[in-house]
């Protein structure tokens, strides 16, 4: 019973198919894993392995007209798969938040940061505009953004990629969701901003007990951030292990290949020793 309570997010036998003109095509199959409270679960694999499809399925963001999602996805015991649009919108942003790889894609260019941030808060709370603005400013201060009141008046194109990503993290964390899904959150950033983003994610996890599903191809990031790791290949899970066990004693040949590829190109890891 205690294990069940500690599993904030549970995915069981997830199977996703997309309809094409040539018939049904399987994107992921037999996907099962659990994310515990206050833990970071790394989801790794090469491009096309099914990582993003898995995260989009959890968030119920795939096109339901062309995509069939089978299996169970529970968030704190509540089944997400099959919820209608209104029900899932109430959950997304409040109970489960999403940080995209490219922060510019997360914002509408014709509205200010403040307009989008404040409306996101108000759509999930009973706060008035002034209260929502105060919460937004507080959340932005927590991720060390300078002059939040001024930033709220800015448009997305006026901010750097690193600053936009920190705004996204502030938006994701401000309502203290039980789960944050971070899909390659550092890929588009320089080393300095990568470090800042990872530090803020770790701070959110430790302060709020937020669970994080961290999707990344960067094994250096995974080795420093994750408690457990899920390795995907061709739409399937090939290995699940504690992060230390995975790096010290990988079992599957594909996992060994990923680790060997990382070593063979002699990656510099400026982030790893600084977190």
Regions found by a protein language model. Name each.
Residues 68-79:
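Conserved ABC transporter NBD signature motif
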Residues 174-178:
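A short, proline-enriched helix->beta-strand linker immediately N-terminal to the Walker B motif
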């Amino acid at each position: 019973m205690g294990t069940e309570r500690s599993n904030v997010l549970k995915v069981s036998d997830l199977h996703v198919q997309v309809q094409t003109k040539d018939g049904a095509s399987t994107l992921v199959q037999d996907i099962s894993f659990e994310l515990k409270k206050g833990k970071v679960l790394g989801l790794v694999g090469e491009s096309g392995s099914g990582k993003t499809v898995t995260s989009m399925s959890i968030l119920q963001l795939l096109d339901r007209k062309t995509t069939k999602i089978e299996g169970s996805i529970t968030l704190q015991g509540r089944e997400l798969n099959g919820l209608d649009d209104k029900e899932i919108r109430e959950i997304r942003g409040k109970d489960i938040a999403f940080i995209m790889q490219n922060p510019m894609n997360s914002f509408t260019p014709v509205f200010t940061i403040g307009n989008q941030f404040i409306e996101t808060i108000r759509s999930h709370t009973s706060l008035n505009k002034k209260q929502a603005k105060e919460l937004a400013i507080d959340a932005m201060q927590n991720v060390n953004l300078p002059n939040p009141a001024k930033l709220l008046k800015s448009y997305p194109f006026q901010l750097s990629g690193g600053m936009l990503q920190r705004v996204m993290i502030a938006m994701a964390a401000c309502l203290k969701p039980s789960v944050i899904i971070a899909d390659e959150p550092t890929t588009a950033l320089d080393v300095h901003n990568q470090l800042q983003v990872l530090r803020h994610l770790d701070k959110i996890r430790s302060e709020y007990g937020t669970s994080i599903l961290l999707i990344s191809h960067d094994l250096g990031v995974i080795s420093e951030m994750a408690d457990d790791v899920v390795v995907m290949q061709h739409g399937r899970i090939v290995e699940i292990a504690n992060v230390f066990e995975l790096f010290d004693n990988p079992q599957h040949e594909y996992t060994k290949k990923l680790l060997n590829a990382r070593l063979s190109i002699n990656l510099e890891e400026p982030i790893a020793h600084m977190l």
